[in-house]
Amino acid sequence: MSARFEGSYLGDATRLADDAVLECKICWQRYDPAEGDPVWQIPPGTPFAALPAHWRCPRCDGDREQFMVVDG
């Protein structure tokens, strides 16, 4: 059983606001939908839940489940 952190994304898009800012719990890289992700060529305005399945943290290559909600 893996450890769960309060606020972790864990793939549950139904509980995530479109403007929610998330942070990687490995390296603290933030994903802000207002900014998108230039490394992965994700345009501004793209909610975290709408990121492609292959998207990973641009800093540490952690998967989406390593992100937790910090605002939203």
UniProtKB/Swiss-Prot annotation:
Chain residues that bind Fe cation: 24, 27, 57, 60
Signal peptide stretch: none
Pfam families noted in UniProt: Rubredoxin
CDD domains the UniProt entry points to: rubredoxin
Annotated Rubredoxin-like domain residues: 19-72
Keyword Iron: yes
Highest taxon listed in the record's lineage: Bacteria
Entry note: cofactor: Binds 1 Fe(3+) ion per subunit.
GO BP annotations listed: alkane catabolic process
PROSITE patterns: RUBREDOXIN, RUBREDOXIN_LIKE
Required co-factors: Fe(3+)
GO molecular function: electron transfer activity; iron ion binding
Keywords, in A-Z order: Electron transport, Iron, Metal-binding, Transport
Biological function: Rubredoxin is a small nonheme, iron protein lacking acid-labile sulfide. Its single Fe, chelated to 4 Cys, functions as an electron acceptor and may also stabilize the conformation of the molecule. Could be involved in hydrogenase-linked redox processes.
Family: Belongs to the rubredoxin family.
Protein name: Rubredoxin
Species annotation: Azotobacter vinelandii
